[in-house]
Amino acid sequence: MSTGLLDSWADAGDEFSAPPEVIANPDGTKTVITFRTNQDGKKVKITQKIKEVKVQEKVHPLIAQRKNWKKYGKEKNSPPGPDTSTTQLGEKVDLKLGTSWKQDEKKEEEDKAHERAQKIAVQTIKCRVCGGDHYTAKCPFKDTLGAAAGVTPSGTTPEPTSEGGAGAAGAGKYVPRHLRADANGNVPTREARDDSTTLKVSQLNSFVDEDMLRNELFAKFGPLQRVTIVRNRETGESRGFAYVSFATEEIAQRALDTFNGKGYHSLILHLEWSKKKKT
């Protein structure tokens, strides 16, 4: 006859060795009943109701056929699915379904154009007193920093006392390179620049740049001293005309006779001397 202690061991062994009780319900579900001992040493009955759900995925027949293809080469014994060490995955593309995709694309382009316009406006507007992105006349520091920057309280630059191209232009205006003073403060005169070999090319398309003029039109006339397209200072877009300087007046005359009145990118070119000839 076994003792009470041995009976409890036997009961514990029967508890853990007994399989769970499974009951089939009329609605297709299953009830699983198990017994176990919790942390307090008490015997607990656990009842679980399980419902089996069959999920069927519909794919294209060709896709299902490709999934059954056998791998070969280095991937012969690899499990199903791509391996990133031997397979390069393409970029994930989000498919937007709907009828308003054209309007959405147009709105995105308008937003990008608005952002570019704001960036250009911020870059082109610069205060001469504090360097901020606002006009000098509206600077909040012009009363305190204006004297150091040479700006009057009204927002204007006082007239310089020295004469010449660089002095008359003022501190906030652009001075062309050929009119800037040298190290000794000497400003070149207008007569020092020779424009006798320079042609003015008008009626240019907006997308034409210096390289197009040089390579497509005037390169065959020999080396060019200067090719400059006049652009808008704020937007950077072409204003439709340019200046081209040649080695000699004879070469410039040949270029004028060749291209004046000829078509170039849907427009008729007009060539003339940048400086009128003396008769």
Curated annotation (Swiss-Prot):
Pfam families, per database record: eIF3g, RRM_1
Region (Disordered) residue spans: 1-26, 66-115, 152-171
CDD domains tied to this protein: eIF3G (cd12933), RRM_eIF3G_like (cd12408)
GO MF annotations in UniProt: RNA binding; translation initiation factor activity
Claim: Transport is one of the keywords in the record: no
Native organism: Candida albicans (strain SC5314 / ATCC MYA-2876)
Name of the protein in its database record: Eukaryotic translation initiation factor 3 subunit G
Modified residues (Phosphoserine): S78
Database matches in Gene3D superfamilies: 3.30.70.330
Keywords, sorted A to Z: Cytoplasm, Initiation factor, Phosphoprotein, Protein biosynthesis, RNA-binding
Annotated GO biological process: formation of cytoplasmic translation initiation complex; translation reinitiation; translational termination
Family (UniProt): Belongs to the eIF-3 subunit G family.
Role description: RNA-binding component of the eukaryotic translation initiation factor 3 (eIF-3) complex, which is involved in protein synthesis of a specialized repertoire of mRNAs and, together with other initiation factors, stimulates binding of mRNA and methionyl-tRNAi to the 40S ribosome. The eIF-3 complex specifically targets and initiates translation of a subset of mRNAs involved in cell proliferation. This subunit can bind 18S rRNA.
Chain intervals with Basic and acidic residues compositional bias: 102-115
UniProt-annotated location(s): Cytoplasm
InterPro entries: eIF3_g (IPR017334), eIF3g_N (IPR024675), eIF3G_RRM (IPR034240), Nucleotide-bd_a/b_plait_sf (IPR012677), RBD_domain_sf (IPR035979), RRM_dom (IPR000504)
